[in-house]
Regions:
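Terminal targeting signals and extreme-terminal segments of soluble enzymes
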Residues: 1-141
Length: 141
């Protein structure tokens, strides 16, 4: 089974992610790509994606990336064993996201034994713009 399929199974019970419509596209070693198709439930009063929507997309993508090394073991054991969780995040909003599909790509900047720093870049492929950059410190629990 591919890592993305394992990740989808492991994170299937993440109810808020399910409500928002975030999809796992690909998973590599400590990397992940997730997408979100914007619709009216994601919009703020100005018609752009609410900042919390972008944050949720980035936070989830970081969780998938940080736990990617456990996905095969999780699948074999049959129960989730997610050991990396968000400790701190910093989001930089760069441009409004108004339409289409948002793509989040998360990669590690520094990987330690107990903490790790990940960067997630959210892009709007429709207009080719980066809409947010998020740095997330993960902690091993």
């Amino acid at each position: 089974m591919e890592k993305k399929d394992c990740a989808r199974r492991v994170f299937a019970d993440d109810r808020f992610v399910s409500l928002t419509g975030i999809e796992i596209v690909s998973v590599g070693n400590n990397e992940a790509c997730c997408t979100l198709t914007l619709d009216d439930r994601h919009r703020n009063a100005r018609g752009a994606a609410m900042g919390g929507v972008l944050f949720t997309l980035a936070d989830f993508c970081a969780a998938v990336a940080a736990n990617s090394d456990r996905l095969d073991k999780t699948e074999a054991e049959g129960t989730p064993s997610l050991h990396w969780v968000s400790l701190d995040s910093n989001i930089h909003f760069l441009a409004p996201a108004t339409d289409g599909v948002l793509t989040a790509r998360c990669t590690p900047l520094k990987q330690g034994r107990t903490t790790a720093l990940y960067q997630t870049i959210i892009e709007s492929p429709g207009n080719g713009k980066q809409v947010a950059i998020v740095e997330t410190t993960m902690i091993h629990v």
